From Swiss-Prot:
GO BP term, pick one: translation
Keyword Ribosomal protein: yes
GO cellular component, one term: cytosolic small ribosomal subunit
Protein name, per record: Small ribosomal subunit protein bS18
Native source species: Symbiobacterium thermophilum (strain DSM 24528 / JCM 14929 / IAM 14863 / T)
GO MF terms held by the record: small ribosomal subunit rRNA binding; structural constituent of ribosome
Pfam families documented for this protein: Ribosomal_S18
Oligomeric and partner information: Part of the 30S ribosomal subunit. Forms a tight heterodimer with protein bS6.
Disulphide bridges: none
Amino acid sequence: MRRERGRRARRRVCSFCVDKIEHVDYKDAARLKRYITERGKILPRRISGNCARHQRQLTVAIKRARIMALLPFTVE
C-alpha cells in the first residue's frame, strides 16, 4: 500500500486541544498510556499528532508518572 505521489497524509489534530485540556496531568495514567509504545517509549509528535505545547507537557507528565510508578520505564 504505497501512497500516491504528491498526496500528503492528513495532519492529525491535538487531542488535548480538542478536549480543551489546559494542563496534562501525570496522574491520568490511562490517557498517558495512549502516547507510549509497547516498548515503553514516548511517541513522537508527528505520530501522536499533538501540538508542540501539549507534547512538551506530555513528555514531562510521562516522566513524572514513571518516577511515581504509575507507568513502567520498560516492559518486562
